[in-house]
From Swiss-Prot:
One of its GO terms (cellular component) is endoplasmic reticulum membrane. Pfam families: p450. It is an enzyme of class 1 (oxidoreductase). Cytochrome P450 monooxygenase; part of the gene cluster that mediates the biosynthesis of aculins. The pathway begins with the synthesis of 6-methylsalicylic acid by the polyketide synthase (PKS) acuA via condensation of acetate and malonate units. The 6-methylsalicylic acid decarboxylase acuB then catalyzes the decarboxylation of 6-methylsalicylic acid to yield m-cresol (also known as 3-methylphenol). These first reactions occur in the cytosol. It comes from Aspergillus aculeatus (strain ATCC 16872 / CBS 172.66 / WB 5094). The keyword Transmembrane helix applies. It comes from the Eukaryota. Its EC number is 1.-.-.-. PANTHER family: CYTOCHROME P450 MONOOXYGENASE ALNH-RELATED, P450, PUTATIVE (EUROFUNG)-RELATED-RELATED. Disulfide bonds: none annotated. GO terms for molecular function: heme binding; iron ion binding; monooxygenase activity; oxidoreductase activity, acting on paired donors, with incorporation or reduction of molecular oxygen. This is Cytochrome P450 monooxygenase acuC.
Amino acid sequence: MQPIVWLLGGAIALLVVVIRAAWTYGHRNQDMPSGPPTLPFIGNAHLIPKSYTHIQFTAWARQYGGLYMLKVGNSNMAVVTDRRIVKEVLDSKSSLYSHRPHSFVSHELITQGDHLLVMHYGPKWRTFRRLVHQHLMESMVDSQHLPIVNAEAIQLVRDYMLDPEHHMAHPKRFSNSITNSIVFGIRTADRHGSNMNRLYTLMEQWSEIMETGATPPVDIFPWLKRLPEALFGHYVTRARAIGAQMETLYEDILQRVEKRRSGGVHLDTFMDRVIASQDRNQLPRHQLAFIGGVLMEGGSDTSSSLTLAIVQALTLHPEVQRKAHAEIDAVVGHARSPVWDDLARLPYINMIIKEGHRWRPILPLCFPHALGQDDWVDGKFLPKGTMVVVNTWGMHMDPDHRLNQKYDPAKFVPERFAEHPALAPEYVPGAWENRDHYGYGVSRRICPGIHLAERNMFLAIAKLLWAFEFQPGPEGEPCDSDPVTGYQHGFLYCAKPYSTRPVLRSESIRETVEREFALAQREVFSTFTEG
C-alpha cells in the first residue's frame, strides 16, 4: 500500500504545482505597473482588440495611468501614455529602449529582418541609419531636395485643379514622387504610376497585418504555429504574400537603377550613393534592395496620409481656411505660390500642420520598442524583454495636457499651437512639457526623414490653401472624420475615401499654377525618368 500512497501523494503534489503555475502564468507581479485584470495563462490577450487598438489603449491609460502593463501569456507589454516618461525613459535611456521585439510575422515571414522599421538594434541597424541620415540630414534636404519638393507641390495643386474627382490619389502621387526621385531618380508623373500603385497596395496589406493584435501571439505562445492558420485568418499565407510583393517590388526598382548606371547615367540619388559605396558597406543583395525600398515606404505613406487628413479637416472647418487665406494673401499674393522661405511669415500654416499631426497621427501607436535590460520606472519594475508601446494617440488626446486645456482635444483647432512657432525637430531635444507632437516618433527610432517631411507638408498645405477653398462635396457624399468610422484600421492611420470640392480661388492663380508647372517640367522633372 505504501508505494501507492507515495504515488498518489506525488501525483497530487504535481497537480498542485501545475495548477499553481497555470494560475500565476499570465498574472503581473506586484512590483510591475498596474493594468487590466488578467486571466490565468492568457493574461490580457483576450482584451486586446484586433483593430483601432489605440482607442482601447487610451481608455486604459485614463483608468490605469500613463504607464501600465498588459500581460500576453507570460510576456509583458508596457504602454506609455505620458510625455514625461517618454522623455525621461525612452529618450534619456535610448540605448535600453531602442530595441525591437522579435516578431515571427515581420522578421521571419515578411522582411527577413532587413526592414529598418522592425530591424533589431545593432550594427546592421546603425549602418542603415547612418546611410539614411547622410542623405536626409537638414543641410542635404535644403541644398539638394527642396527644389524637387517645390516642383512636386505645384503639380499637386495642378492635379487637384484638373482632376478633382481623384483627390484621394493626388497626395499619394506627390509624396511617392518626391521620395522616388530622391531615392532612385525615378519620379511618379501621374496617379497611374505602376511603382506607386504596387507600393500602396503592399502598404495597405502590411499595415493591416502589423497592427497590434491583428495576428495570433505566436511569439508568446509558439505552439500556436502548429494550429491551422485558417483559424487565424490565414495569417501565414498573407504574410508570405506580402513579403514576396515587397521583395519583388524593391528588387525591380533596384535593377532599374543598376541598369541606368550601367548605361553611364550616374545621378546623385540615395541609391546611387549606396551602390557607389558598396566596396565599403558590403550590403548583401536583400539588404541593398530593402534599404531603398524602406525609404520609399516611409516617405510615400506618411506625408500623403497626413495631407489627406488635413484636407479633410479644412473641408470641415471653413473658418480655418478663411484665416489661412488671409495670411497667405497678405504675404504671397496670387502672382506666385508659397515657397519654403515664406515659412516664418506663414505661422498659421505651420499651426495647421502641427494640428494635423496631433489630430490624426499617422502612427497612433509607435511601432513597439523592446527593453534591452531590466529597468525601474517610477518605482515600478520592467523586466528585460518587455515590449514598450508609446501611445501617441493617447498623449495627443490627453485632456489634461496644456495644449488641450483651452481647446477640446477631439476638435481640429490650429490655434492651440500658437506658442510653437518652430519646426518639429527643434522641440524633440527640449523639455517634454514643450514638445509639440509625437508624429515622428521618439528616441533613436525617430523618423530619419523628419526634415524632408516637414518641408513636404509645409509646401503641400501652403500651396493647396493658396490655390483652393475646400468645400463640402455634393449633398449625401460623406466627409467622415470620425477616428473609427472615417479612418482605416492598421498600424498606419489613413482617412477612408471622403468627399471634398477644391474650388480655385481666382483665375490669376490658375495662370500662376500653369506657369510654375511648366518651369518645374523644364528645370526639375526633366532630370528624372518616370515609373
